[in-house]
Amino acid sequence: MPGGGSQEYGVLCIQEYRKNSKVESSTRNNFMGLKDHLGHDLGHLYVESTDPQLSPAVPWSTVENPSMDTVNVGKDEKEASEENASSGDSEENTNSDHESEQLGSISVEPGLITKTHRQLCRSPCLEPHILKRNEILQDFKPEESQTTSKEAKKPPDVVREYQTKLEFALKLGYSEEQVQLVLNKLGTDALINDILGELVKLGNKSEADQTVSTINTITRETSSLESQRSESPMQEIVTDDGENLRPIVIDGSNVAMSHGNKEVFSCRGIKLAVDWFLERGHKDITVFVPAWRKEQSRPDALITDQEILRKLEKEKILVFTPSRRVQGRRVVCYDDRFIVKLAFESDGIIVSNDNYRDLANEKPEWKKFIDERLLMYSFVNDKFMPPDDPLGRHGPSLDNFLRKKPIVPEHKKQPCPYGKKCTYGHKCKYYHPERGSQPQRSVADELRAMSRNTAAKTANEGGLVKSNSVPCSTKADSTSDVKRGAPKRQSDPSIRTQVYQDLEEKLPTKNKLETRSVPSLVSIPATSTAKPQSTTSLSNGLPSGVHFPPQDQRPQGQYPSMMMATKNHGTPMPYEQYPKCDSPVDIGYYSMLNAYSNLSLSGPRSPERRFSLDTDYRISSVASDCSSEGSMSCGSSDSYVGYNDRSYVSSPDPQLEENLKCQHMHPHSRLNPQPFLQNFHDPLTRGQSYSHEEPKFHHKPPLPHLALHLPHSAVGARSSCPGDYPSPPSSAHSKAPHLGRSLVATRIDSISDSRLYDSSPSRQRKPYSRQEGLGSWERPGYGIDAYGYRQTYSLPDNSTQPCYEQFTFQSLPEQQEPAWRIPYCGMPQDPPRYQDNREKIYINLCNIFPPDLVRIVMKRNPHMTDAQQLAAAILVEKSQLGY
């Protein structure tokens, strides 16, 4: 019955293969062909298993056929050993045919049969179907190798396509991670255009979103990045704690009436608003409602859902403002004041559609608070909707508006779709986060802005400074930048006036109103920054610390400290040594024409304008001091110097003009007109010269080292015509030591026929030396003025500057009779051109003002030729006389 056993074995194997794997028809045929032969061989092999030494587990073929022919045992064992070797190839990984042959040869011996049989019984005897399965698997190996080779051919194509797409993206500047993100999202078969589109979208997303994403969650995150971006404010709202949210103060009446369409007091609207803020995480919410809203609803005051008010009151959210009835009349406290006051004190948000104009006008801080913290709203079908931009499109978002501190800086513009690859530059209207706070302007616009800033800075540091622009207590270092940036002094009036007009618009008009006059144009020396060195102390009432270096100690090109004069003040002092004063008088920079500015003619430039002052004008002038002691009074007038007609007097040497100073006018010069007739050095102040008020003086005792009368002849002469200017008679006081002289070289622009003015406020005296002969004219390196302090400037030599002529002032000894003199009491006649101008001005003013008034003012100011100043004086006179 071995044939039946083999058939059953074949059936079992086929059923097992049908369960475990697919068997092709060709494989099944091969298997059926091997079935009979293998079954016959196994039958012979199992016969020998009747040996009592063997395991009791034996197949059915051995039991049914106990007696078998043993002649072919060696042959059968050899075949079985070969089968065992084939099965051992799968189980024990032994593929050697030589070993199977050895087993066959050894199996002939009876002692070794048991060992071989044990090895064979370990697998084939107990599980015979495994042997055939292993053989069938070996038969499948060539087919599997074919399929694996086909599959191995496909990946190189996929890898090559992936590498191509990756290289293409890398050339465009994208990273490999971004390419992997896109390929995982779109798939490996995606077209290159689709990949590029996704890369562009992915490149515009913030780097923070990219770093958060990981490789494991690439597909999920890339598909939801846009939704996360749109929902990020809500996420931030959820993460906000109550500490970073502002308190909310709700105008209950306004919200309820708005929800009731201004007809019904709808308490449900208050509930909706409160719930909206509670959902956002706000904990500090207060609703103000007048107490009379708890009353029963009436036709004229409809109220709905009143139970909501009581519920919110129990939750300590709603507060009733006081209201009561007095003799049948309801007295209601102003609930809006409660709302604004609480919101202001708690730094919260007011929720209302009311503008609170009446309360905003009460306090400026309330107005500012209402403008910045008022949150308006709308109701859309029982939905409370505040605006996303409470303060307008350029203001903060609603989220940051309700926060104490903004969490994320908001981008006002939409991100640029091109990102870093945008080629629009500064013209791109989209937001570029990579540019940061860089100016969104072109290079040309930047250069224009820089040039405007430079021009404005140059104008502020220009060579002209308003006379009332610097306070009296200002130190020299405050204007060091101005001095440093000032150009060299120029005589061209157009350059000066252009800069000055810009400065004049920015300067206060306080002192203009005080002096009732027009400020004068003055120039700043550009190189007047040399600090005064310690030399001889002054003895003319200046502070003891004021010193001036002699010329030999000062390097060439360095100018002495600029002497400054305040408005309505006359004592010259260096800028660093100004005494401090409390008077609102400003320090200015005045040129040598301070006391002569009333001579500024609008038309001709007559060189005969040399006698600028008369006794009447002198007596009517005012000198006001900054303080009772140590103050500075200056004879600076506030009229313009007529630049347009080139009447400005400039010095050939820049050192001269800096050191020509106004002298202190003492009260005795006002009380006694004698010093003027004796050619005193006293400037005139015209601060209120148009007024009939008596001038106020701070009487000071005369300086002890100076005589009351220091007469000296003020003679301005040219070497060509010394006889044109007669000299006043000498005085007994002319022998006083150090009366002073100086050589002053001046010019009136390019006019060579220059004259000096009598009683010049900036005149310097040359001390007379008895060793000198009569008429000898020295030119020392420095001069001593009437008050005895040194003037550190040098006189230019004729050889170096031949176009300028020297003028000298000399105090002649009394025994010497001068060759020319001026009449003692008389004043020189005005030149014809001067009179012609006065006549023209008189005619023009008579066409505007009453002739009598014009005549009075022009008589009072005989040497004034400025029509504007005369008109101002006429207006003052007219107001005083009551015309």
From Swiss-Prot:
GO terms for molecular function: mRNA binding; RNA endonuclease activity; zinc ion binding. Residues 503-515 have a biased composition (Basic and acidic residues). The modification Phosphoserine is found at S230. Signal peptide: none annotated. Residues 53-109, 139-158, 456-551, 680-738, 754-775 are annotated as: Disordered. GO terms for cellular component: cytoplasmic ribonucleoprotein granule; nucleus. Keywords: Endonuclease, Hydrolase, Magnesium, Metal-binding, Nuclease, Phosphoprotein, Zinc, Zinc-finger. Gene3D superfamilies: 3.40.50.11980. Residues 245-400 form the RNase NYN domain. A zinc finger (C3H1-type) spans 410-435. It holds the Pfam family UBA_6. Its cofactor is Mg(2+). Induction: By cytokines (TNF-alpha and interleukin-1) in acute monocytic leukemia cell line THP-1 cells. Belongs to the ZC3H12 family. May function as RNase and regulate the levels of target RNA species. This is Probable ribonuclease ZC3H12C.
